[in-house]
Amino acid sequence: MGKNEIVAMILAGGQGSRLGVLTKKLAKPAVPFGGKYRIIDFPLSNCSNSGIYTVGVLTQYKPLELNAHIGIGEAWDLDRAHGGVHVLPPYQEEKGGEWYKGTANAIYQNIEFVDRYDPEYILILSGDHIYKMDYTKMLDFHKEKQAEATIAVIEVPMDEASRFGIMNTREDLSIYEFEEKPKNPKNNLASMGIYIFNWKTLKKYLREDESDKTSKNDFGMNIIPSMLGNGNKMVAYPFKGYWKDVGTIDSLWEANMDLIREDNELDLHDEEWKIYSVNPVRPAQYIGENAKVSNSLVVEGCVVNGQVESSILFQGVQIGKNSVVRDSIIMTDAKIGDNVVIEKAIVGSGAIVRKDCKISLGDEIAIIAAKEEVKMGTVIENNKAV
């Protein structure tokens, strides 16, 4: 097997329990986003756009839909004879296998895969964040600083810093302390869960960590503190673009709504940095004679006969006559009947809302699970899936 300078590993096994019924039957990275994407499309596209063509995707929880979506990686130009994309479930041995015990253990179980390409560096990514990043710039920074580990960081509001892993740095951006969700943070440089390591160095720490039976086998809790404690040079790479952890209902809704704001930082129309995905061929969308659509994303295959305001309609969505959909996300192939009102909701893929229903919880976000049916005349008054 030939040598690669860098191999990317995407941690995509998360259950996404905070997304409730939206991840009941699929992994968090497979959750639909932005009308025609899935969350995993962002790190995969970033890798391809950065010229990184050897990518491992580490799956675990409910992987079938995610595996089918990735396939051989053709959508991201990752269907390659050398390298390409590889889906990597927890390793199975003759004595039996087990789930990944933590983020570090997930990489440890795939040391043999990485070693096939003999890389100088390894890029560790999360499969559940929305952002666009040129990883080659981060790698150049890592080399320039002669670091053994580089961690991408982003400034967050100080009153939210206690929700993140915080990097305390010197003026030269070298890291002298890492605090996991500190009660009283010293600064607001939050880890983005994006790491570049010198592979030989990381491999040594992974093996040591695996032999420690008290370890949580986690990068934030174990690997990074160990490297800092031993004096390995670690630096913070500041990122200035759009980045969103969409691990909660609120953040997923907000990230989708960001796409229809005038000051949208993500800009999915950027021809220089496209986000790729797998989408079936659909007919053009149809907007009925009495329909009204404003400030919304309406993609292929949609049929709209009602009113749609500040919403995102995924492929194949149908909106009935005299219905109003406002501030909502309607996922693939969902069907909304006649005389329905839906406000500030997420309607899962394939769900059916029969006629004469009202779904509106004021400031709360209403959730309808994928493939669920809301019966005719239903009024949803609490934040529970039907």
Curated annotation (Swiss-Prot):
InterPro entries: ADP-Glc_PPase, ADP_Glu_pyroP_CS, GlgC_bac, GlmU/GlgC-like_hexapep, NTP_transferase_dom, Nucleotide-diphossugar_trans, Trimer_LpxA-like_sf. Pathway: Glycan biosynthesis; glycogen biosynthesis. GO terms for molecular function: ATP binding; glucose-1-phosphate adenylyltransferase activity. GO terms for biological process: glycogen biosynthetic process. Its EC number is 2.7.7.27. The gene is glgC. It is an enzyme of class 2 (transferase). The keyword Nucleotidyltransferase applies. It holds the Pfam family Hexapep_GlmU. This is Glucose-1-phosphate adenylyltransferase. PROSITE patterns: ADP_GLC_PYROPHOSPH_1, ADP_GLC_PYROPHOSPH_2, ADP_GLC_PYROPHOSPH_3. Involved in the biosynthesis of ADP-glucose, a building block required for the elongation reactions to produce glycogen. Catalyzes the reaction between ATP and alpha-D-glucose 1-phosphate (G1P) to produce pyrophosphate and ADP-Glc. Belongs to the bacterial/plant glucose-1-phosphate adenylyltransferase family. Keywords: ATP-binding, Carbohydrate metabolism, Glycogen biosynthesis, Glycogen metabolism, Nucleotide-binding, Nucleotidyltransferase, Transferase. HAMAP family: GlgC. NCBIfam families: glgC, PRK05293.1. It catalyses: alpha-D-glucose 1-phosphate + ATP + H(+) = ADP-alpha-D-glucose + diphosphate. Alpha-D-glucose 1-phosphate binds at residues 100, 165, 180-181, 191.
